[in-house]
Amino acid sequence: SKTYSITGWRLGYTIAPEEITERIKKVHDFLTVGAAAPLQEAVIPGLRFGRDYYDELLKTYTYKRDLFVQGLDAIGLEHTTPQGAYYVLMDISRYGYKSDLEFCEMLARDVGVGAVPGSSFFREDVNYLIRFHFAKKDGTLHEALNRLEKLKKL
């Protein structure tokens, strides 16, 4: 889903001997529902992309990551700097909210920036992180950073 900027889509494949493939199919049937036929068709062109596509994708995501994390740094917000993900986790513990969901609701309502509660991604009781997705247009990232400046006043 990250490689082709289709976040949320889940599709995978295996290449294996027939006897292993039969076992994989049995396990797969118990764990998932099938990927939608349009999704399966949509991924075919992506499997044919050459190395240049992936090199350019790396440059693009690295640029967007750096743009966003440098903006967060300039505002003084604590965050992770991902090495391979298309999102940044920001530490909200200094704001005193009881939950990351509560903070995300305030952020959307009062600041005009959407984020996902980090607790959605942890088995442990982690409620002091929120997740920003940076695979966006540059203008969207700049606008989000401008709006996040409001957090300085909290």
Label for each model-derived stretch:
Residues 1-154:
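PLP-dependent class I/II
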